[in-house]
């Protein structure tokens, strides 16, 4: 955290109740300013754990122990969220949910290069992380157990934003609603050709409001997905605002073949 002024308050996305802690779990927070460590567990609390920094400066917060969740109850703001500049490690806390963990953290610049393999919920994890230079290195993240990516990157609209998700295993994800919604930055050009979608995954508004890609982008994506024998079935997906290449009102032959294969699996593509 980069604290600009004396007596600045910040809050962590942690509450002292059973939504964050299972029985027997607790964490110890080192605030990085020489103050006493704070122990947090399920004590029935209903507010976010906060701290006041008496002096301006850069502080590293360390959290040890165990908890099942780091995140917020919906898309709510917490004190000092824009002052968070980097997350160096997710540790070994046993976290399963990062729901809205970094919501509206406009100053966030970097995240760990590995994700805990216990994580299943990434709902809104980086929603409105819209700093101009924000482009997290998530290329090696193991997301194979994740089921919820709803709004994961929504409104990540910074000019540099274009995370490498090319090797992500999203085969267990059931919710991709607004996943890339409003990712309107100049660099945005996601490579998803290796993805295997789960049968029936909800992709409503997956790209709504995002930067329009060249028609070749959708051509290549459809051909790659159709060639994947493990690709799921019964999927309704709206690629809007993106379109595939058309010549005299018809898709290219390879794209037409891909559409036929996917539609044969029960896909509805718009």
Task: List where the protein language model places each region.
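Negatively charged
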Residues: 1-270
